[in-house]
A protein has these predicted regions:
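N-terminal cationic leader/targeting segments used for protein routing and processing
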Residues: 4-8, 94, 156
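Conserved alpha-helix in the HATPase_c
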Residues: 50
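A short, charge-rich alpha-helical start-of-domain segment used by transcription regulators
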Residues: 2-36, 46
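Arg/Lys-rich amphipathic alpha helix in sigma70-family domain 2
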Residues: 78-98
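C-terminal and inter-domain tail/linker signature
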Residues: 20-24, 32, 40-46, 54-57, ...
């Protein structure tokens, strides 16, 4: 294959994209339940969303190598997610004995929780078995299939895990709020793309999660920031909704959304409020990483209804779903 031929590479990309959407048409109805399972395993909405997406990618790739479709799609997806998560936990190197003087809210929440609960209290298999049984009412046979093991091993894992699984309550310290976040809010709410791009490092990564990723201020100026600021003009006009499901965007007004900072479990988040004829609601959340007075990473969660719904519920904010997918024009 000549990967320098644009016609060849564009045709391949189109075929893969079309196959991916056909795959999602079939398996996406299982996504909310798969997210709940991954949420139990990872104990982080962000990590759960990543695990779900990785599991779907893995399933999509494997499907092309299988002689026949999985007989139990639900158990098959749970099995892929379980194996991915177990492999990741087992790959973590043992942490040194914790030093209280070095404990910091800067440590990733997922690492602290994995070290404190997943590794010291339960083995990965024990935790997965307990979650599948108690939260999803899987039978022993279904758990064995999902974890690629025997029913006898499942019984042992459940017996051990139930005795050890105690969910501790974590007191998370709020991370300091970088001044650049206030500057970002002010620039965004003023609709000032120049000021927004000036806050980015030259190597900054700007991502609309599960849609596209851009690098650097100029790419953000032309792409991601334009969509975040002015995409509502398209959402409010059904005739220009190519790529989006109109069912999700009823009552949207063509106004630039506003952002505000909210603290969620120790992390400062940018919450995007969209105007609707029946009241404002949150449709997106942005996470950022900063280095001094510049942003190194911007991740906009727009097509992630499970994550957005959970966080908005905890923050007691009204929420509207955008669905899971972005469809490009044919």
């Amino acid at each position: 294959m000549d990967n320098r031929n644009p016609k060849v590479t564009d045709a391949l990309r189109h075929d893969v994209e079309a196959s991916w959407h056909r795959f999602l048409d079939l398996y996406e109805p299982l996504r909310p339940e798969l997210y709940r399972y991954c949420r139990h395993l990872t104990r982080s909405p962000w990590d759960a969303d990543d695990l779900v997406q990785d599991a779907l990618f893995r399933a999509f790739a494997r499907l092309g190598c299988m002689n026949e479709m999985p007989g139990n799609p639900r158990a098959w997806l749970f099995r892929i997610a379980s194996n991915l998560w177990i492999d990741r936990v087992r790959a973590q190197k043992p942490e040194p004995e914790p030093d209280p003087q070095r404990a910091s809210s800067r440590e990733p929440r997922a690492v602290r929780e994995a070290a404190g609960t997943l590794l010291s209290r339960l083995s990965p298999q024990e935790r997965a078995a307990v979650v599948l049984k108690e939260a999803f009412n899987f039978t022993l046979e279904e758990i064995a299939e999902a974890l690629s093991t025997t029913q006898g091993t499942v019984k042992s894992a459940l017996h051990r895990g139930r005795g050890k699984l105690i969910e501790p309550v974590y007191q998370v310290e709020a991370s300091p709020k970088p001044a650049v976040l206030d500057a970002f809010c002010a620039a965004f709410n003023a609709g000032d793309v120049d000021r927004l791009t000036s806050l980015l490092l030259d190597t900054a990564e700007i991502e609309v999660v599960r849609v596209h990723t851009e690098y650097g201020p100029e790419a953000a100026r032309r792409g991601g920031f334009q969509g975040m600021l002015f995409g509502t003009r398209r959402l409010a006009d059904p005739a220009r909704l190519a790529g989006l499901d109109p069912a999700f965007f009823r009552n949207v007004l063509p106004q630039v959304p506003r952002v505000e900072l909210r603290l969620h479990r120790g992390e400062w988040l940018l919450v995007h409020w969209y105007a609707h004829s029946d009241g404002d609601a949150v449709r997106a959340i942005t996470r950022v990483e900063a280095d001094g007075d510049r942003l190194t990473r911007v991740r906009n969660y727009f097509y992630t209804p499970d994550v957005l719904g959970e966080i908005c519920a905890e923050l007691q904010l009204p929420f509207r779903s955008n669905g899971y997918r972005y469809w490009k024009e044919a």
